[in-house]
Amino acid sequence: MKVRTLTAIIALIVFLPVLLKGGLILMLFSYLLAFIALKELLNMNMIKFLSIPGIISALGILIIMLPQDAGSWVNDLQLKSLIAMSFILLSYTVLSKNRFSFMDAAFCLMSIAYVGIGFMYLYETRSEGLHYILFAFLVVWLTDTGAYIFGRLMGKHKLWPVISPNKTVEGFVGGLICSLIVPLVMMIFVDFNIALWLLLIITIILSMFGQLGDLVESGFKRHFGVKDSGRILPGHGGILDRFDSFMFVLPLLNILLIQI
């Protein structure tokens, strides 16, 4: 418990100033987190980061996370690069004599999209305004807290025992309820330029998908037979273990709240 608490304190000391500062430093930090998360994901599937598929995947992350405001050429480059990488990875299945399979190629492409899009929206959301990124983090944290408390106090019905045996329906609902505290409080101090009832609906959707993101990452770990995605955060596991909910919440937040 002491190790877990100490890790959380150190992580906050490092991450919070970067998040508040935003800009280039957050973008570079997001890239760092994305590369670590990609390595964790590839390791689950026994694909080495410093291998041809690993390097191609890292290049995909590099391209897919390019700032969207850099120009229209970015989207064109991203599309053409993903097409090229698909052909290269599929060709490598033949060159490796199926030691690298078609499923591995699909896994690499999925990893690029899953990790790259999630962490791209970490700095993209911050660039839209500090209140948006704080909103996302608070929704996820209140959801996790509510799910834990309600699950411990009232949890009787398993939510998805095959994937995550400890999660309950009561915890899931409790997470949704607690997440609503965020818009109710933030609307007092921040103008989201949206009606409160609509923001409450968006919050519920974000809370639901945040919990789904947690389950998806749990599904990865259970499928590959690992307890944690990594060991870079003592007591907490890996980067994916800490950011799994955000992989779903941040892109969805941009679609539902920022871009409407």
Curated annotation (Swiss-Prot):
Enzyme class: transferase
GO cellular component, one term: plasma membrane
Protein name (Swiss-Prot/TrEMBL): Phosphatidate cytidylyltransferase
Reactions catalysed, as given in the entry: a 1,2-diacyl-sn-glycero-3-phosphate + CTP + H(+) = a CDP-1,2-diacyl-sn-glycerol + diphosphate
Nucleus among keywords: no
TM region(s), chain numbering: 9-29, 46-66, 70-90, 102-122, 130-150, 172-192, 196-216
Phylogenetic lineage: Bacteria, Bacillati, Bacillota, Bacilli, Bacillales
GO biological process, one term: CDP-diacylglycerol biosynthetic process
GO molecular function, one term: phosphatidate cytidylyltransferase activity
Topology term for the membrane: Multi-pass membrane protein
Subcellular location field: Cell membrane
This protein's pathway: Phospholipid metabolism; CDP-diacylglycerol biosynthesis; CDP-diacylglycerol from sn-glycerol 3-phosphate: step 3/3
Top-rank taxon: Bacteria
Family, as annotated: Belongs to the CDS family.
Keyword Phosphoprotein in record: no
Documented EC number(s): 2.7.7.41
Record keywords, A-Z: Cell membrane, Lipid biosynthesis, Lipid metabolism, Membrane, Nucleotidyltransferase, Phospholipid biosynthesis, Phospholipid metabolism, Transferase, Transmembrane, Transmembrane helix
InterPro entries in the cross-refs: PC_trans
Major subcellular site: membrane
One Pfam entry name: CTP_transf_1
